[in-house]
């Protein structure tokens, strides 16, 4: 390990470019309809949860969004600043000023002014408030819908996985090795869950959850009965959607029975072997000897 002496040497810390993405997660029509402001939302445009992450290569593995149960969240009519398309977004009220300038806000009963790509100020108005706990259970569309969430069914599986497999035998399949059993669980994923660890110190107050990356994500997903998004290789082993370099696996590396059951081959083929593309921001990280 590194000693405190080594970590305090001159030049040990440096500003470098790190990766960051604010993702748009589109609510399903049924979920929009559950909101009191549904009519206002539908009359303006599509509605999205927005979630910020510094690990964009984990986004293909997203299966849930986590909100703070007691935080104040707002529905906002605005524009996509890159395309100028009218959209609705949902985020923590406390974080609005980090994404939208106060100069662009108009009253709820005032029509939004027009916006064009390149304009400096993005118009917006807040049309409703919700506590995080009111958003629990709302569903959104899979961000990259090429692979369905799958879990392994064995003696180590969580009870919610075993119970789901027993209740849905039509979704259970055996890997090509004729040994390992799996269950497709798309219906249980892509919904909002609650977490006390969510903060409004940065980001949007909505946390993107990828159970295959990190113990915290895995635990909160398991507690909420959220399946993970795996790939299954030819040995019947589970692998994350991308490797540690952020590259999509090739189809020829995957179990054929898994591909037949859970993969949209046409869509996946467009991306196999590619790297997840990232935006960049300056972030202070430690530069240790040898890096």
Regions inferred by a protein language model and the residue ranges of each:
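Non-cofactor substrate-recognition interfaces
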Residues: 37-49, 56-291
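Active-site cores that bind ATP or allylic diphosphates and position pyrophosphate for catalysis
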Residues: 1-50, 57-59
């Amino acid at each position: 390990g590194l000693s405190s002496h080594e970590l305090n040497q001159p030049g040990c810390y440096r500003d470098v470019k790190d990766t960051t993405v604010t993702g748009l997660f589109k609510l399903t029509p049924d979920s929009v309809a559950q909101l009191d402001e549904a009519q206002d939302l539908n009359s303006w445009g599509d509605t999205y949860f927005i979630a910020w992450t510094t690990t964009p290569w984990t986004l293909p593995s997203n299966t849930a969004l986590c909100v703070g149960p007691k935080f104040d969240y707002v529905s906002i009519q605005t524009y996509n600043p890159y395309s100028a398309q009218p959209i609705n977004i949902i985020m923590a009220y406390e974080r609005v000023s980090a994404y939208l300038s106060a100069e662009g806000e108009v009253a709820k009963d005032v029509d939004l002014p027009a916006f064009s790509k390149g304009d400096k100020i993005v118009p917006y108005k807040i049309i409703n408030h919700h506590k995080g706990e009111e958003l629990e259970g709302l569903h959104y569309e899979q961000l990259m819908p090429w692979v369905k969430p799958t879990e392994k069914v064995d003696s180590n599986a969580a009870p919610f996985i075993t119970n789901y497999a027993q209740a849905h035998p039509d979704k259970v399949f055996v890997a090509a090795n004729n040994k390992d059993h799996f269950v497709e669980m798309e219906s249980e994923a892509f919904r909002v869950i609650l977490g006390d660890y969510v903060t409004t110190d940065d980001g949007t107050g909505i946390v993107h959850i990828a159970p295959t990356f990190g113990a915290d994500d895995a635990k909160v997903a398991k507690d909420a009965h959220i399946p993970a998004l795996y790939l299954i290789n030819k040995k019947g082993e589970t692998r994350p959607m991308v490797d540690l370099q952020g590259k999509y696996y090739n189809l020829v590396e995957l179990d054929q029975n898994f591909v037949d059951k859970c993969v949209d081959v046409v869509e996946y083929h467009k991306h196999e072997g590619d790297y997840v593309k990232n935006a960049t921001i300056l972030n202070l990280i430690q530069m240790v000897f040898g890096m």
